[in-house]
């Protein structure tokens, strides 16, 4: 009965963890409008009622973003796009604790700390809309669990190794930065995980033989990664010093790398775990997690239970934590022209692994800790549900502008103020993509410009200013003539267009801080 109760409590916590994704019309994720626009274009690439066939073509090459875009596009055949995306995000939120439990069970450790992962699903990476990266995290934890099983489950090694091969390749198809963590994590697990045959093994070959299936399981993923590296690095990178979104020099040259100081990284390590809402309310679920973890740490020291792991195997989880922290503190923030916001993303992974490293306590205490961990989902559902609904009310200005947008629009986003009163991230930055996606049009800035997108422009991309962050560089004569809709936020249209507003342009709608200007 107690085991059944534990399962019901855990299931309820998982439902509460994903609930905030379903209580609001809009989600506060900076890049989400861009993602949905590209998925819509991918799904309707041959739809003549849209601009997509004219603007975009499939990029028939290996890119690390294929996983998210194609998964949601497939779901879109069954349900509307927004619902498909929420189902995908729900799978990520629920998958985070489930994958952590899978890893812990493979290591022979108690699984109750996995539920503490739920509040960590909604942090800085979520606010920026790094959905590909987020989706790769549960898959990476599953890879670690599969790798350990391929080493230790003597009669099922081939099956676990085959599953590992598939999962590792899938990680790469979601995000290469998570794959980079596994490039360090799997060798560490190989070195610290004993196999049953070690007891009687004599010589290197005898120790290596039972590990061969696990090693073979990583070969397809590594081969896929090398193929992508050759393809990516073989493409010429456009070098323009000082230009946004372009390399400033050779890939790893000092001028092409942007760093955060150690002090800044240290200060942000805990902050980025809960920095979504301006009122700081999202810290309360994290405080609850911290309180449970602190109690578990004290109980593990005062009333320790025999560890199921040997002295070397006991180092596996702390080692994984140190690897994630090393990536956080030692990597650059940007590799210009290649990848951005690099090191800060690993804070979430380090925190997840740290929670999984809590000391083992007696079974009776583990049940209490499981209930306490599940209880952390209550403030999570309340705080994030309220916060998401508050943001959705603010973002309803998009809905008004969509109604005033014509079919097949060419929308230029001029976002002078991307900020929100509710969330800290600049969530209104890509509002033009929301209008374009709703009406089957195009925008002045699209992720189709990036080499990791599954789509590319058919011809020359539409003219625009160098960075979506700098609308003050907009030039109507050379850029504006290519568009028939203009989304302006944070500045009156008269300041942007002057006399043209009375002649060739007119205000079609205004809501909140945004205006929609259309060509007459």
Residues covered by each model-derived region:
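Short acidic/glycine- and proline-prone juxtamembrane loop motifs at membrane-interface regions
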Residues: 128-136
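Transmembrane-helix signature of polytopic, membrane-embedded enzymes
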Residues: 3, 100-121
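Short periplasmic/luminal acceptor-recognition loop of GT-C membrane glycosyltransferases, typified by
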Residues: 391-394, 401-491
